[in-house]
From Swiss-Prot:
Similarity-based family: Belongs to the universal ribosomal protein uS2 family.
Pfam families: Ribosomal_S2
Residue spans of biased composition, Acidic residues class: 245-254
Keywords for the protein's UniProt record, in alphabetical order: Ribonucleoprotein, Ribosomal protein
Region span, Disordered: 224-261
UniProt source species: Lactobacillus gasseri (strain ATCC 33323 / DSM 20243 / BCRC 14619 / CIP 102991 / JCM 1131 / KCTC 3163 / NCIMB 11718 / NCTC 13722 / AM63)
Name of this chain's protein: Small ribosomal subunit protein uS2
SUPFAM superfamilies tied to this protein: Ribosomal protein S2
Molecular function terms, GO-annotated: structural constituent of ribosome
Length: 261
């Protein structure tokens, strides 16, 4: 069973690539044809590769993986935030701050500052400070929230990064490559697919296309996490059963001892 149907892909415009003069030759294997100066992506390959991406993401989620969704272009901002949040994961949908991954310790210090400012605003500290100082602190808090709010609670460097438009997010992709973090990405006809570990050939400019693919990745995480929960339940049940059997064995021994007495 496919993750999405051909009809869904067509309706979302996933097949529309870039103008033929703006292309990366390495994407040739994923191009079906060209029409009116626009490359048309081979959706048969998109379906197959999206299924592969779905299964990969689901497997990582089932092992308790942490995911970071990245998409800072205007068309991607809402979908990236909403789908990452729906899956209980993390996101960057504003400007990528250089070193977000490769200088994680520094980023964590800024996240700590964000949490401190939030606490100050909630516990009444701002109420007793001069208005000018409060204005400066509020501005600082809003800026940090804008850039770091999506990773504020991320416990560690992600196990997988999902990217909308890796050409635009080349710094994020490069940092992931340096750290060996697998990258799953929507790759359009104007983008070099080589830095991407799991390629999903797709229009990365249309809002509906971004929403569809991002949603599929969120669904994969949710399904994987459900599988993890089920596995944990089974393990707990088996552990409880083993403990109960041990208790029974002890009870039998006690009975034998009593009978000998």
């Amino acid at each position: 069973m496919t993750v999405v149907t051909m009809k869904q892909l067509l309706e979302a415009g996933v097949h529309f690539g870039h103008q033929t003069r703006r292309w990366d030759p390495k994407m040739a294997p994923y191009i079906f044809t060209q029409r009116n100066g626009i490359y048309i992506i081979d959706l048969q390959k998109t379906i197959r590769m999206l299924d592969d991406a779905y299964n990969y993401v689901k497997a990582v989620a089932q092992d308790g993986g942490v995911f970071l969704f990245v998409g800072t272009k205007k068309q991607a901002q809402d979908a990236v935030k909403e789908e990452a949040t729906r899956a209980g994961q993390y996101y960057v949908n504003q400007r990528w701050l250089g070193g977000t991954l490769t200088n994680w310790t520094t980023i964590q210090s800024r996240v700590k500052r964000l949490k401190q400012l939030k606490e100050m605003s909630e516990d009444g500290t701002f109420d007793v400070l001069p208005k000018k100082e409060v204005a400066l602190l509020t501005k600082e808090m809003e800026k940090l929230e804008r850039f770091l709010g999506g990773i504020e609670d991320m416990p560690r460097i992600p196990d997988v990064m999902f990217v909308v438009d890796p050409k635009k997010e080349k710094i994020a992709v490069h940092e992931a490559n340096i750290l060996g973090i697998p990258v799953v990405a929507m790759v359009d006809t104007n983008t070099d697919p080589d830095p991407i570990d799991v390629v999903i050939p797709a229009n990365d400019d249309a809002i509906r296309a971004i929403r569809l693919i991002s949603g599929a990745m969120a669904d994969a995480i949710i399904e994987g996490k459900q599988g993890q929960d089920d596995s944990e339940d089974v393990e707990k049940e088996m552990a409880d059963k083993a403990a109960a059997e041990n208790d029974d064995e002890e009870s039998i021994e006690e009975v034998v001892e009593k009978s000998e007495d």
